[in-house]
């Protein structure tokens, strides 16, 4: 491989790492922004303090999607930001705008809306909105991890700590 080819490969790799890093940053910002509605939704969704704390570990590999009230909280949080239709399905346009409201959100908005939509299609038969939304969230997390856009728990915890100090 010639020097020019190696230089080109290096530039492409650095660009890809930068793009992935930017996507993860956007995902972190969207996660934190979305999470701002959690406290307001805690009572409505009958979420205990313990289960509410579980939300801070959403991006951990071993996070469990097994409590209906987590799905109810996600539904409430989505409604808080007007991200759901009357049938508790994703409102594509509003979700796109919500994601784009974050710095560099336009980089990831189309991908995120597509991932959520594909997950909704997989779980559309579930009649209970809370359970369906919980399954969609699980599918979304798996899809984000596979796509390399899921933020690490280390990054999320550092951000949570920084926000608590403010």
From Swiss-Prot:
Give UniProt keywords alphabetically.
Disulfide bond, Olfaction, Sensory transduction, Signal, Transport
Disulfide bond sites: 41-76, 72-130, 119-139
N-terminal signal peptide = 1-22
Q: Tell me the superkingdom of the source.
A: Eukaryota
InterPro entries, sorted: Odorant/phero-bd_Lep (IPR006072), PBP/GOBP (IPR006170), PBP_GOBP_sf (IPR036728)
Provide the tissue specificity. Answer: Olfactory tissue; expressed by the glia-like support cells that ensheathe the sensory neurons and line the base of the sensillum lumen.
Record's SUPFAM superfamilies? Insect pheromone/odorant-binding proteins
One Pfam family name is PBP_GOBP
What is this protein for, i.e. what is its function? Present in the aqueous fluid surrounding olfactory sensory dendrites and are thought to aid in the capture and transport of hydrophobic odorants into and through this fluid.
Please describe the quaternary structure of this protein: Homodimer.
What's the name of the protein? General odorant-binding protein 1
* Organism ancestry: Eukaryota, Metazoa, Ecdysozoa, Arthropoda, Hexapoda
